[in-house]
């Protein structure tokens, strides 16, 4: 994990999503709908809904869109049955890729994901073929331009709040937590006046793969193709972010 800033990759993803804001809001609405349908429409009593609402707010999703998705899930109208499916495989150069989907048509989604891999130099694998290369973690990113704090001061606050570790780059402080302690750490740091450029539970690669030339171009095209699919919620990979920011 050390030495591999997540902030550049998050910025790249946010910039790409800004260009496709309507699609991003649609995917977030679907995630909110599923969380509310499965666990109820009260965020205080539904941790999954609470987390995705935070994610939606961080993406500047309008409050009325959030409320609409919750009402749709908890109302009396006919409901859509979405199923979460995870695909695992390898991109060009052996980059590990995990794709998280929410779909109401497994056959359509499987065909689209398989096509994205095959057309961009990758291949789908069996369940579990790459998941062992990732670890589920809470990640809180603080933009250093927004907070004039010393690294040691913030590290102490993070540890006292229950964080596991913190990494520092020129642009950001990146605080890692267990999934279980994520909300507690976030709330305690917010009470100290901190705000987050990104706050999510994500999959962190344990090893990284560096690509260049045509392999890198194909890998970036694979990521873009997958993220552009309406059924795909998240794409996790272990491509070294330092090469992404140069593109």
Curated annotation (Swiss-Prot):
It holds the Pfam family TACO1_YebC_N. It is found in: Cytoplasm. Gene3D superfamilies: 1.10.10.200, 3.30.70.980. One of its GO terms (biological process) is regulation of DNA-templated transcription. Residues 1-21 are annotated as: Disordered. Keywords: Cytoplasm, DNA-binding, Transcription, Transcription regulation. InterPro entries: Integrase-like_N, TACO1_YebC-like_2nd/3rd_dom, TACO1_YebC_N, Transcrip_reg_TACO1-like, Transcrip_reg_TACO1-like_dom3, YebC-like. GO terms for cellular component: cytosol. GO terms for molecular function: DNA binding. Residues 1-14 have a biased composition (Basic residues). Its main location: cytoplasm. Coiled coil: none annotated. PANTHER family: TRANSCRIPTIONAL REGULATORY PROTEIN YEBC-RELATED, TRANSLATIONAL ACTIVATOR OF CYTOCHROME C OXIDASE 1. Belongs to the TACO1 family. This is Probable transcriptional regulatory protein GTNG_2524. It comes from Geobacillus thermodenitrificans (strain NG80-2).
